[in-house]
Amino acid sequence: MPTTMIPLEHYRSDNTTAAYSLRWSWAGWPSTGAFPSLDSNSWGTLHSLWEKDGIRVLERRCTDSQWQLTVSSRTNVVPSFIVARLKGRIDHAFRNSKSGFQFSRKVSLRSLGSNTEVEVQNYIANQVQKAGFCDPKFASQLSSFTRKWEPSDCSEAIVVTSGRYWFQLHLVLVIDHRHSIRDLQFLGRLFEEVQSIALDRRYRLSAVSVMPDHLHIRLRGVVEESPEAIALAFMNEICRGMKINPIWRPSYYVGTVGAYNMNAVRE
């Protein structure tokens, strides 16, 4: 593998594509009393404004004591921005109606996925076994670069002044041209570099699996960074930290993960 110092930002939003599934459950409560109602025109306006923010409302459940919105977002949308925009635009709609309503500061944003965190954790942990390598010795050595952190604290809430966040991601990076790297020493260095980056950037790892042609990471992010920023950070900093030429396909997969899946939200 050629060694050189790559530019600080070889992978950027303008030259890297993403496949993604980012879904969230937002909940807000009134400071006192009950929520006022909004008519269909007001909701339509809110939905249109949120779309411009990169947020799409998938479902909503509103009672007098709690409003819950299930939303999706684009990769460049920061979790704290989702909370600010959902709450802020509803606040503005209520101010226009002169209802006198005030939100509680107690809000929450919870990441959701098609699969639960346990299912994703097990999927990552079984990568080597699932691959069915012909060489059992290679498979055994490669399995050293798959790790689960148990018990994982990724599912713990991030508590900030604006509320509570549950922010878990599953990130997949693929070696360019799907080239298979069989150098175990190199793969071991990559495994260590992932952990170093997570520590430096205050991410919490739950599972990592380094495979010859791709990489899986399950982590808890920080609410000030978007899924896109986290993915690009790993893509760039792995290469920079290992002092190698860019090795990744200029694309990635990122999906939200949580204790609950979408079916649980709909029940």
Write out the residue ranges for each language-model feature.
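Charge-rich, low-complexity N-terminal segments
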Residues: 2-267
